[in-house]
Every structure is written in C-alpha cells, then in structure tokens.
Amino acid sequence: MMQDLRLILIIVGAIAIIALLVHGFWTSRKERSSMFRDRPLKRMKSRDDESENDDFDDNVEGVGEVRVHPVTHAPHGAHGEHEAPRQSPQHQYQPPYERQMQQPARPEEPVRQPPQPPRQAPVPPQQQPAPHAAPQPGWQQPQPAQPPVQPQHQPQPVVQQPVAPQPVTPTVAQPQPAAPQQPAPQPVAASQPAVAEPQPVEPQQPAAPQPKERKETVIVMNVAAHHGAQLNGEVLINSIQQAGFKFGEMNIFHRHLSPDGSGPVLFSLANMVKPGTFNPDSMADMMTPGVTIFMQVPSYGDELQNFKLMLQSAQYIADEVGGVVLDDQRRMMTPQKLREYQDRIREVKDANA
C-alpha cells in the first residue's frame, strides 16, 4: 500500500509541475504578444507626427516660393529670349494646391518632360555627322537628300575591300596538297587484313572440356561365401528376387526405383564369375563363389539414399545365403570403408553441382 501511495504522489507531483510550467509559458507569451501590439500604435503615432511636420514644412516652402516668383517676372520683360527657358518655375506655383492635396505634386514630374523638343533642335547639325546619324534613319525623313553626299565618301573604303579577297586565293591552293594525302588511307586498309589474321585466335571456346570435368565413380561391394565354400544358386535367386532385383539387360539383375521393375535403375547385381551373367533357367543348379553389386554415381535421385538401399540389399542377401559382405577389394566391409564410399559420393555430387 505504501508503494502504491508513493507512486500516486509522484505522478500527481509530476502533473502539477508540468501544469505550472505550461501556465508560466502561456503567461509569458501573452505578455509578449501584448507588448508587440503596443509597439505598432507608437509607430503609427510617430508617423502621424512626422507627416504633420512635413506638411507644415511644405506649406512654409510654398509661401517662400510665391515671394520669389514676382522677382523673376521683372527680368523676364527685360531680357526677352535669353530667359525664356526659365519659365519652368512658373509650374512651381502649384505648391499652394499641395496644402489641400499632396498627390498633384507627383504629376508635376511629367510636366518637366518637355526637354524632348530641344532634341529636335540639333537636327541641322546632323548633316555634318551624317555617318553617326546613319543608325537612326527611321526618325529622320529628310535624309534622302543626303545619300548623294554619302556615296562620295563611301567609294574610298570600297577600294580597300577588293584587297581582302587576295589572301583568299592562296587558301584555294592549300586543298591541292591535301588531295595527294587522301590516297594515303588506302594502304592503311591493306594493312588491316594483316591485323585481322590474329582474330581467328580469339575463338577459343573451352566449352568442350566442361562436360569432361563431370566426375563419375562406381561404388562396388560383394556378397561372397565363406573361405572354401560356394553359394547355392536356388537360395541365391530367391534372395535376389526378394531384395527387389529384376532380371533385365545384359543378362544381369537390376534394382529399379520401384520394386515392380519400373522406373530408372538405381544399382545392379552381376555374377562374380566371368562373364558375370546369369541364366535364370539353369540358375537353380548353379553354384558360385559370390555376386557383385555395383552403383554408378551420379545416378537418379539422391545417391546417398541409393547407397544405403544398396548396402541393405547386400546385407539381406548375405544373411539369406550364409555369406559375408566384402568391399571392392574383396575385404571385410568396415565402417571406415563405408565412410570412404560416402565421401566419394559427396565429392562427385559437389563437382557436378
């Protein structure tokens, strides 16, 4: 119970601390937002004060200009044409209207654009810098009278232009030596067949040796009678048939995948005496020192499982006829020899994988 109370107190304390922290952050942000809201009001007030001061200054300047303009009218009657361009201050009488609205002060700027007419005044001196005025033929229509003056100056550079084609003539002579160089690549084509001779060396396809690398082996074991004895043919043929062997090709017995004699051959059984064949009709009267069981690897299915079935068949026949199981050298079968057979089978499987 005490532990539960401690856990509850710890959880409640943690929740209270988190609530205090959240409340503190919320209040601080609220204060900051109120401070930022007050600032734009102060800025607006300061801007309003500045705008009022500017209006007052503009009004003062407008009054001053009115006093100056009557002084300019006196020289205007005295000097005449020399002071004609000074008429621009007449447009400055508009500042009194700025007291009511400051926006008409801006349209005064386009009124100052009449300096464009003085650009047309230099039209008479353009006759001398006619070459410079050439890029602006579209603006000056009276230039058709000037073209007869320009051809007098242009024939001089025209005389220099025929000098330029003179260096072009030697360039035409250069391709002539290039023509004898073109037959040079022809002997190169003749040298290419010499290089093509080693090409027949490239078709080296060692694909043929790959099937030769396929390893094969034959596992052999014997079922023989004891020293100085022989196996009875009638008992032997009965044990062979009970082991699942069927008489077939090459006049020997074969163990098929299925005991009824169907399917691929797993291993075979032959007579130990040459030529190694059997005669089923006279086999009951036959006597033999033993039989040989052999399996070719690789074979159908799992070779290790086929080897176990082969060993079981040999032991069954040996028990039925009263013989022993021997290895390929006709020695007693040992566990070491069996492992050797299995290693040979694995080696062939790995090589052919």
UniProtKB/Swiss-Prot annotation:
SUPFAM superfamilies in the cross-refs: Cell-division protein ZipA, C-terminal domain
A GO BP entry: FtsZ-dependent cytokinesis
Ranges of the Periplasmic topological domain: 1-6
Gene3D superfamilies: ZipA, C-terminal FtsZ-binding domain (3.30.1400.10)
Membrane topology: Single-pass type I membrane protein
Topological domains annotated Cytoplasmic: 28-353
Bias-annotated ranges (Pro residues): 112-134, 177-186, 200-209
Span list, region Disordered: 42-214
Taxonomy, superkingdom: Bacteria
Plastid as UniProt keyword: no
Keyword entries, A-Z: Cell cycle, Cell division, Cell inner membrane, Cell membrane, Membrane, Transmembrane, Transmembrane helix
GO cellular component, one term: plasma membrane
Regions of compositional bias (Acidic residues) in chain numbering: 49-60
Subcellular location: Cell inner membrane
Keyword RNA-binding recorded: no
Biased composition (Low complexity): 151-163, 187-199
Pfam families, per database record: ZipA_C (PF04354)
Transmembrane intervals: 7-27
Family indicated by similarity: Belongs to the ZipA family.
NCBIfam families linked: septum_zipA
Purpose of the protein: Essential cell division protein that stabilizes the FtsZ protofilaments by cross-linking them and that serves as a cytoplasmic membrane anchor for the Z ring. Also required for the recruitment to the septal ring of downstream cell division proteins.
Subunit structure: Interacts with FtsZ via their C-terminal domains.
Name of this chain's protein: Cell division protein ZipA
Protein species of origin: Klebsiella pneumoniae subsp. pneumoniae (strain ATCC 700721 / MGH 78578)
Gene from which this protein is expressed: zipA
